[in-house]
Amino acid sequence: YGGFMKSWNERSQKPLLTLFKNVIIKDGQQ
């Protein structure tokens, strides 16, 4: 269970962080 959650977090965290950074950049440009 713990290993599954860890691998899932590692896989899903990078796209989420990229999306989050893109939103911050867009908000800053507006």
From Swiss-Prot:
Pfam families membership: Op_neuropeptide (PF08035)
Organism whose genome encodes this protein: Oncorhynchus keta
UniProt keywords, alphabetically: Acetylation, Endorphin, Secreted
Keyword Phosphoprotein (UniProt): no
Sequence positions bearing N-acetyltyrosine: 1
Protein name: Beta-endorphin-2
Gene Ontology cellular-component terms listed: extracellular region
Entry annotated with the keyword Metal-binding: no
Primary site of residence: secreted
Cellular localisation: Secreted
Biological process, per Gene Ontology: neuropeptide signaling pathway
Signal peptide limits: none
Domain of life: Eukaryota
The family this protein is said to belong to: Belongs to the POMC family.
